[in-house]
Amino acid sequence: IFSKVRYEKISGTDKDIPLITNTKLYSDNAYYANSYGKGGISYYVLQNLLGDDLFFKSLHYYIDTWHGKHPGPYDFFYSINHASGKNLNWFWKKWFFDWTYPDLSINKVEKYRNGTKITIENKGGLPLPVFLEITASGKTTMLRSTAAVWETGKNLMVYNLNLPFDSISKIQLGNEFTPDKFKGDNTWAP
């Protein structure tokens, strides 16, 4: 994921073109960021989504099936779908065909019954895992959700926590591996 920073720079711009696009049509910056940055990050997100065992099982199925042949992108997509037993077409569409970019934000934090309701917004439309670090009463808790939370196409997801609203001192969205174009809306404090 060494190319995360470079990909973040071009994400959401006219250089952030769908991965399915023939690389001969890329400019130099777009070629590097898409081929290495965005491409590599898509596999990281897929691995996070499937879990290590299923990801590597599916990848080995693809490699074994297509060894010595000339697979195209669709062969990869269908092989992973078949081996994982999951219909990941929603994932392939957003990562490889659509004009999406990485931008998650903390949309709203509010008191909800006896706890706290945290709403995360996917502004860029790219399915990404959600990592939330919550500091409350001097303790830090990490919440994690895979990119599957965006499978239905909705751009909002909600955490309802049994954590008193007034005890929260900080909420931080993201981690060092997940790209985000606009980080200014990734921190919340009362």
Report the location of each language-model feature.
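Short beta-strand edge segments in extracellular beta-sheet folds
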Residues: 188-190
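Hydrophobic alpha-helical and helix-loop surface patches within well-folded domains
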Residues: 1-121
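Asparagine-centered polar/low-complexity signal
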Residues: 122, 185-186
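Extended hydrophobic-aromatic, low-complexity segments
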Residues: 56-57, 71, 104-105, 127-131, ...
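Short acidic/polar inter-strand loop motif in beta-rich domains
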Residues: 139, 174-185
